[in-house]
Amino acid sequence: MRGELNIPALSRFGKSISASLHHQNGSSRDDNDSNPYENRSSNSGLNRRNSVFGLPSSGLSSRLSKPSLSSINNSNNSSSNTGGNVLPNPALTPVRNMSNKPPLTWSPSSANLFGTSKVTSIIGNNVSDVVPPVIKKALASSHGGGMSLSIVLLEPVLYLAGFDLNECQIENPALLRGALVLRVAKPANIRGISLSFTGRSRTEWPEGIPVKGHDTYEDKVIISHNWKFYEPTMKDADAPQHGADVARLVGEQLPLPSSAAASLRGYSVFAPGEYTYNFDLAIPNCFPESVEAKMGWVRYFLEATVERFGTFKSNLNGRTPVQLVRTPSPASLSSSELINISRDWDERLHYELQVSGKSFRLGEVVPITFRFLLLDKVRLYKLSISVVESSEYWCRSRKFHRVDPKRRVLLAERSAKHQNTDNLFETPDEGDGLSSAVFNFNVALPTCLVKERDRLTFDTTYKYIKVRHRLKALLVLSIENTENPEKRKYFEINIETPVRILSCRCVKDSTLLPPYESSSQGDNQVLLPCPCRLATTHVEPTEVTAFTTQSVLASSAPSAGRPAAAQISRPAQLFRIPSTNPPPFDGDVCPPACNTPPPNYDELFDVLSSISIQDCETDRANDDTILNNRVRRSGTIREEAPHRSLSRTVSRSFEIPR
């Protein structure tokens, strides 16, 4: 038993060495007996540290402790007395001999790791000064606060372009980009880090599937994609960054075992720091958008999981939603093409309805114009504008179908105070064909913050949930009753046209390119709150994300740089194609005067004609010279025919003997 060392790796109290070692190292025994509790605590603490890191006790303690000169001499003397076969036991080094500046992995201040502690190392694929944004609230954290998990999205809202299949195939797909941020305050044993992107849909069927069936809903998985960021079996599993794209490590780092040891143990030790794992995924435009209907929904979310090693260590799970918004294709004219309806009613009234577009977002103001031309004695008592919403649901591969009752939301209404005497036309009902009336409305669509009975759902493209809208105008008219002049005949005219309602997040600054004259790039920021909420509440600076890409605040508030004349709303009948940012009326600037007048074509024609005549004379002289040379060479002289420049006789070739 000479030199035998017995240090249990997981012992609660250290029985440090055997009796034979005490006999051979008397000096060390005397020092140890002077303070047995100190030795016992140091041995047990180091042994537990060895069991965590999977290292021999001698190698680890020599790196963590700084023994004094007397202890080194005593160890050398003991080794020389035993013939050099017994190595000194560094685990017996007292705690008082350790350096005054221990590593941060042992420091209690590491619990406040991301408060005032200093980052001493940054490890990444590309070393740069880019630091991940500060996360306001973690999605998941451990019980003691030693580990937290967060998901940062570069674009919190993704826009899918196109409502038709052809438009979806032409446009580029949306790109989901972000980072998973893992913060570790003290060394932790981790078995795996993964992230999944999932899209699910559900339709509610209270009457059962089929009718009086047991199933009252149907769930479907639209997409499921997984990322494996870290596994113990991966290459370089025990590297300092553990597969992270950017790793910000805190304190002095200890050398860790090889990847083979991590694969055998089934976990790796993550040093204190912040680990960032980037991810991206292309989402085709043919995918359904996020929907929250009355009897169904479509939702997308990212779910991160951190598997921890240990008996009483629970896994960290965090989930964050991802919104997919459907927008018209940039090549589509639905937002700029006008709706014009022109009809005649019983040869008594000619009316026109004009709407400045075919697609509008929730909360947007829609200009609507009515024009009337009186052909007879007609009175108008009521004029109302509303939106009618129809919803349809399918399930079991579209075998079962349900149509919900239509919902009508009133937008604007104008009526006469006294139905018998008043008239909205405000003109005597002469019916001479010359009197007319025009009504302009600025109708505001309801936002997503209104009451449930007045709330609208935007149009959907999902094949199991269909929501459509129609704009409806109601006219209440009256004419004279020839049979009873004291009473009038009343009629109702319904005007309907399909319109497309978009999500409230389809603001111009998010779906269109920014103006070229904007020089400041830092002002365009993505705001997580809904634009409907921005119009009613004040947005705090903390709600603005750290990534600057787009803006929705500019669409909800008038621009301060534009003149007051540009902010005045124009009637819809004054322009054919409405602009998203029209200039003021006096904003047109005349082009500069042209300082180069056109040339004098008479002189130019004379010069060109003289040049053409000289060219003809030169060509004729050249032909005569060639002909004389050929005649002299043959030896025969023939009488040449006179030149006829304007004759149409058939030319004959000269007979030259050969």
From Swiss-Prot:
Gene Ontology molecular functions: calcium ion binding; protein-macromolecule adaptor activity; ubiquitin protein ligase binding
Biased composition, class Low complexity, residue ranges: 39-81
Pfam family for this entry, one: Arrestin_N
Compartments in which it is found: Cytoplasm
Family note: Belongs to the ALY1 family.
Taxonomy, superkingdom: Eukaryota
Organism: Schizosaccharomyces pombe (strain 972 / ATCC 24843)
Protein name as catalogued: Putative arrestin-related trafficking adapter C2D10.04
Database matches in InterPro entries: Arrestin-like_C, Arrestin-like_N, Arrestin_C-like, Arrestin_domain-protein, Ig_E-set
Phosphoserine PTM positions: S653
